[in-house]
Amino acid sequence: MAVQPTRIGLAGLAVMGQNLALNIAEKGFPISVYNRTTSKVDETVERAKKEGNLPLYGFHDPESFVKSIQKPRVIIMLVKAGSPVDQTIKTLSAYLEKGDCIVDGGNEWYENTERREKAVAENGFLYLGMGVSGGEEGARNGPSMMPGGSYEAYKNIEDIVLKVAAQVRDSGPCVTYIGKGGSGNFVKMVHNGIEYGDMQLIAEAYDVLKSVGKLSNEELHSVFSDWNKGELESFLVEITADIFGIKDDKGDGHLVDKVLDKTGMKGTGKWTVQQAAELSVPAPTIESSLDARFLSGLKDERVQAAKVFKAGGFGDILTDQKVDKKQLVDDVRKALYASKICSYAQGMNLIRAKSIEKGWGLKLGELARIWKGGCIIRAIFLDRIKQAYDRNAELANLLVDPEFAKEIIERQSAWRRVVCLAINSGISTPGMSASLAYFDSYRRERLPANLVQAQRDYFGAHTYERTDVEGSFHTEWFKIARQSKI
């Protein structure tokens, strides 16, 4: 038990909570911790002792936990989103006082954060919704943090988060005050949506290299390790290289080949796609990555479908195509990078659309800066995004930034070769294909949408605009078409 009041408290000691608490303590801030399951409290206290006698103090009941923290109190919650958050707030509120601050560090739906901020304000409490990215390793050694809500609440923890967040040599701590309301949770949600896209694109690169190029796991390990030294340098490419190098400890071969091809999810990707639809922001790369996870979940159905089509002469790979491995690796690298630009462009445009709708005033370049370290999507590429928004804060789309436009033009031939090769081989590349379609649609001055609008006017009298005259028009297409047939 702490003799002096601690600087901060943390409730919820699953992996993320434990590691963040230890990180805070290691940075010199005495911390009180609490969990409903008391064994987790004892486990965390024991870890603190083993990891350097850190100033971390455990409590088995909420009252003594709250009262151990210096005023105005700051308590971070890291519990499952939804009703567990409401229950934790209710439990803690019984002992909090006016001016105390609650910080939700989980992946919460942004409107829940806004609701809770208003609700606790009635008791005089402050509230923050703070996205935390980086997984268990990031939480322990320095995550990217996205706090939004009460600015006064943020100032109460600013000294802590500036030290606890990941530190990037050329751009500082990976944390900033995001904005009002649920902006912090919304930004973290879209971060996760971009993460879905990134992971899917990397998986497709792997599939093409393995299924068409016949690269071994050793070769894949080498390729991804090389990629991580260039424009694709990132956490996800780094861990992908690691994965290909790990042997199975329960049998022969590599572990990656024994992992069931069925991807789980926790909901933030789905939320991102739903918000994109609600705001009419095209996000096909992120959407396709979500659909890919849904399809992966249909494992039993896919097993049966494979039998049906194999009986009809369709194997996993339609044709074995002779390819130049070196050329293929280079083409796939370029296709992955170009697709990645599209995925980030979609995510940034979604954040901007929500910021405009809610009046948050979010700075997209600053978001790219705090994602450069600690988080799952951290990448050297984010420096380029920050520079793009520094050049033009009103940039309509990353695709039309002069530097990114030049890079896409240089890579688009390789991008098309990879997508065509995959299609001809019967390999699905939904992320790369969707990214390419997004690019081709966005760069074309005229799309076939004129025909779709004409059809809508034909059957529903929805009217249309003309290219040569201002105004709204309706044509009796059916009547004219029938008269012309007489």
Swiss-Prot record:
GO biological process: D-gluconate metabolic process; male-female gamete recognition during double fertilization forming a zygote and endosperm; pentose-phosphate shunt
Catalytic class of the enzyme: oxidoreductase
InterPro entries referenced in this protein's UniProt entry, alphabetically: 6-PGluconate_DH-like_C_sf, 6PGD_dom2, 6PGDH_C, 6PGDH_Gnd/GntZ, 6PGDH_NADP-bd, NAD(P)-bd_dom_sf, Pgluconate_DH
Superkingdom of the source species: Eukaryota
Keyword Protease carried by entry: no
Description of the deletion phenotype: Embryonic lethality when homozygous. Defects in pollen tube growth.
Annotated residues for binding of NADP(+): G12, L13, A14, V15, M16, G17, N35, R36, T37, V79, K80, A81, N107
Enzyme Commission code: 1.1.1.44
Catalytic residues in the record: K188 (proton acceptor), E195 (proton donor)
Subcellular location(s) of the protein: Cytoplasm, Cytosol; Peroxisome
Keywords: Cytoplasm, Gluconate utilization, NADP, Oxidoreductase, Pentose shunt, Peroxisome
Gene3D superfamilies to which the protein is assigned, alphabetical: 6-Phosphogluconate Dehydrogenase, domain 3, N-(1-d-carboxylethyl)-l-norvaline Dehydrogenase, domain 2, NAD(P)-binding Rossmann-like Domain
Family: Belongs to the 6-phosphogluconate dehydrogenase family.
Name recorded for this polypeptide: 6-phosphogluconate dehydrogenase, decarboxylating 2
